[in-house]
UniProtKB/Swiss-Prot annotation:
This is Small ribosomal subunit protein uS3. Residues 39-107 form the KH type-2 domain. Pfam families: KH_2, Ribosomal_S3_C. One of its GO terms (cellular component) is cytosolic small ribosomal subunit. Belongs to the universal ribosomal protein uS3 family. PROSITE patterns: KH_TYPE_2, RIBOSOMAL_S3. The lineage of its organism: Bacteria, Pseudomonadati, Pseudomonadota, Gammaproteobacteria, Thiotrichales.
Length: 223
């Protein structure tokens, strides 16, 4: 039938880590979760030009550690780190606890589902034909080492009166295999004809249980 689970959610705890890592009592859980949502919304809005892929939030003791994964770290950091310090102060006001901000560069934005989805959405807003935008994104992803990619756009494509969905795929995208490293993200293009939704699936290969254990051991060794 038409029921499809979120590819990221179904892999949590298996080959995917949670975006927020902390513990809270039942009385404080909703408050902390709401803080995380507000912080992510604020950072995505503030760093709209920085190509932010994901934001990870950790809360060790009474502090917060935020890791921003971006394809343009220079925009986030600013000259001599001034911008990131201003950002830290603003996030501190939102959370009310000491905040540490780390920046990690996304080495291959062409195979990052979030960045690809936003790129396609931006092209649609600039009136680029949707098939051309999809084809260009797929070619760039396959050249950068992706094993497969699927892109779907939905809405009043090309200004048509009736909304429809179109999709294209290159390579293979095994959604049913849990060990398959499938990156999934969505974006929205705000056009004069209305909102066009963009969904992107990128298959990067398989992650075996032994490899996962090795990664965890490496992290422990680094600590």
């Amino acid at each position: 039938m038409g029921q499809k689970v979120n590819p990221n959610g179904i892999r949590l705890g298996y080959i995917r880590d949670w975006r927020s890592t902390w513990y809270a009592d039942s009385s404080r859980y909703a408050t902390k979760l709401n803080e995380d949502i507000k912080v992510r919304e604020f950072l995505h809005k503030k760093l709209a030009a920085a190509a932010v892929s994901k934001i990870q939030i950790e809360r060790p003791a009474q502090n917060a550690k935020i890791t921003i994964h971006t394809a343009r770290p220079g925009i986030v950091i600013g000259k001599k780190g001034d911008d990131v310090e201003k950002l830290r102060a603003e996030v501190h006001k939102l959370m009310g606890i000491p905040v540490q901000i780390n920046i990690e560069e996304v080495r291959k934005p062409e195979i990052d589902a979030k960045l690809v989805a936003e790129s396609v959405a931006q092209q649609l807003e600039k009136r680029v034909m949707f098939r051309r935008a999809m084809k260009k994104a797929m070619q760039a992803a396959m050249k950068s080492g992706a094993k497969g990619i699927k892109i779907m756009v939905s809405g009043r494509l090309g200004g048509a009166e009736i909304a429809r969905s179109e999709w294209a795929r290159d390579g293979r995208v095994p959604l049913q295999t849990f060990r398959a490293d499938v990156d999934y993200a969505t974006a929205e293009a705000l056009t004069t004809y209305g909102v066009i939704g963009v969904k992107v699936w990128i298959y990067k290969g398989e992650i075996l249980p032994g490899q996962i254990a090795e990664k965890k051991n490496n992290k422990k060794g680094a600590k």
